[in-house]
């Protein structure tokens, strides 16, 4: 496993990380989570991602209990969680000072931890002044409940505004953004965020490297495997949107490239994401140890992605966004 700094911070995170979205509390219980997490550690993963909203908090409970029972040293791992959707009440969601503080304390209780390493604002909140959110995230850091803070699915403008507020108030700005990034979702990472890397040293922990499994090739025959996330009731609409013929045709076109390198489609897709120098860590998911073992081999695929190979991939997927002319 390779380790990178998370943005311009001194925090080292594994190139590949593990996220609890969908799986913990929906498809996996504590016993299964323990084997999955230990398999990740055995492959050098030190970074594990969660959120207060995942399985309505159950994902944090499962991860916390699993880590406790595994007996891991807290200093050996990097844990992140995300705040925004905490419950049904009017103050149980969003990025007000009240919800950030109360939501963080509730997450730590579920995780059974004194702190998380990174706390994300899970979405932007137009109803709360950015100064209030920045102050609240700094309060959480000052209390020792989190060491760093970041954003998830924010726009470049919103992140720039957060940094502007932090600079004005002489406070800590966000060091990391968590966007979707894969061969079919590239605009933010490759164009919109370009000024953020230069101006603020923002790092990225990207999610959905396999486009919800589409880039594994398992949906290419049209049928949805019963153990896949698209088989879950909540993800039926996602399945209909993602499994369009054009995308599946492109995935099929990637197969010869993967075969030539002697790797799987999943390994190729994950390595492709990790090869972007602005990506600090690629968040992966899995329901079985065998999936983790396959995914982790993507680290060895990164050096194989020469400019020639990347060009071959681009000719198939044809999804490269145009860079804005105004940015140098």
Swiss-Prot record:
Subunit text: Forms heteromultimeric complexes with potassium channel alpha subunits.
Single GO molecular function: oxidoreductase activity
Record-level GO cellular component terms: extracellular region; monoatomic ion channel complex; plasma membrane; plasmodesma
Similarity comment: family membership: Belongs to the shaker potassium channel beta subunit family.
Identification of the protein by name: Probable voltage-gated potassium channel subunit beta
EC number: 1.1.1.-
Matching SUPFAM superfamilies: NAD(P)-linked oxidoreductase
Binding annotation for NADP(+): 21, 27, 49, 152, 178, 207-211, 218, 229, 285, 287, 291, 294-295
Keywords carried by this UniProt record: Ion channel, Ion transport, NADP, Oxidoreductase, Potassium, Potassium transport, Transport, Voltage-gated channel
Catalytic residues (UniProt): 54 (proton donor/acceptor)
